[in-house]
Amino acid sequence: MRVLKYAILGLLRKGELSGYDITSYFKEELGQFWSAKHSQIYPELKKLTDEGFITFRTTIQGTKLEKKMYTLTDSGKQELHDWLIRHQPIPETVKDEFMLKAYFISCLSRQEASDLFKDQLQKRQAKLSDLQGSYEKLMASAEPMSFSSPDFGHYLVLTKALEREKNYVSWLESILAMIDKD
């Protein structure tokens, strides 16, 4: 299944966007739970155009730079809707290199294990701080949050990401206490 297809269709549901705009969403809001690179996005835009799910118009920026502005077609809206209402199985386990290292922690000295977990804790705390900043920005710019709010979907994934990182930080702290004990 081409999930990137649905991510792009969903973004275009908000309105007309350029490929650059779509890439920016993957670096910001969508980046909290989904990733896609420039090299993946543009071929997918071509496929979606060929399938009739999106169209584009070309604009000129400056004197020469052509910019494609993409919009969702009615069949693209229907394709997105059909995907949204389709129930999905729970995905396979996400690959997490740090957790693989944790599994083999007995190969490390106590100090090496502590250093590994401290490094991960620092990175997760920084990520949590970034997410908290995004949350504060969202809540300051939004009307009271409800199902009918235009940013409700962003609120959902952001609060889930916050909870995930809070739990990860808490878990790392408890494991560090165990490692450093004795």
From Swiss-Prot:
Pfam families (alphabetical): PadR (PF03551), Vir_act_alpha_C (PF10400)
Impact when changing S149T: Retains the repressor function but is not completely inactivated by ferulic acid
Gene Ontology annotations for the cellular component aspect, listed alphabetically: cytoplasm
Effect caused by changing Y70A: 3.7-fold reduction in the binding affinity
Annotated effect of mutating E97F: Lack of repressor function
Compartments, record wording: Cytoplasm
InterPro entries: Tscrpt_reg_PadR_C, Tscrpt_reg_PadR_N, WH-like_DNA-bd_sf, WH_DNA-bd_sf
Activity regulation statement: PadR repressor activity is inhibited in the presence of phenolic acids, which directly modulate PadR binding to the promoter of padC, leading to the dissociation of PadR from the operator DNA and expression of padC. In the presence of MgCl(2), binding is not altered by phenolic acids.
Induction pattern: Expression is low and appears constitutive.
Site positions per UniProt: Important for activity. Contributes to protein stability and DNA binding: Y70
Family annotation (Gene3D superfamilies): 6.10.140.190, Winged helix-like DNA-binding domain superfamily/Winged helix DNA-binding domain
A GO molecular-function descriptor: DNA binding
Effect of deleting the gene: Deletion of the gene results in constitutive expression of padC and constitutive phenolic acid decarboxylase activity.
Domain of life of the organism encoding this protein: Bacteria
Keywords: Cytoplasm, DNA-binding, Repressor, Transcription, Transcription regulation
Outcome after substituting L128P: Lack of repressor function. Strongly reduces the capacity to bind to the padC promoter
Quaternary structure and interacting proteins, as annotated: Homodimer.
Family: Belongs to the PadR family.
Function comment: Transcriptional regulator involved in the regulation of the metabolism of phenolic acids. In the absence of phenolic acids, represses the expression of padC, which encodes a phenolic acid decarboxylase (PAD) involved in the detoxification of harmful phenolic acids. Acts by binding to the padC promoter region, preventing the transcription of the gene.
Domain-level remarks: Contains an N-terminal domain (NTD), which harbors a winged helix-turn-helix (wHTH) motif that is used for DNA binding, and a C-terminal dimerization domain (CTD).
Protein name, as recorded: Negative transcriptional regulator PadR
Organism name: Bacillus subtilis (strain 168)
Lineage: Bacteria, Bacillati, Bacillota, Bacilli, Bacillales
Gene name of this polypeptide: padR
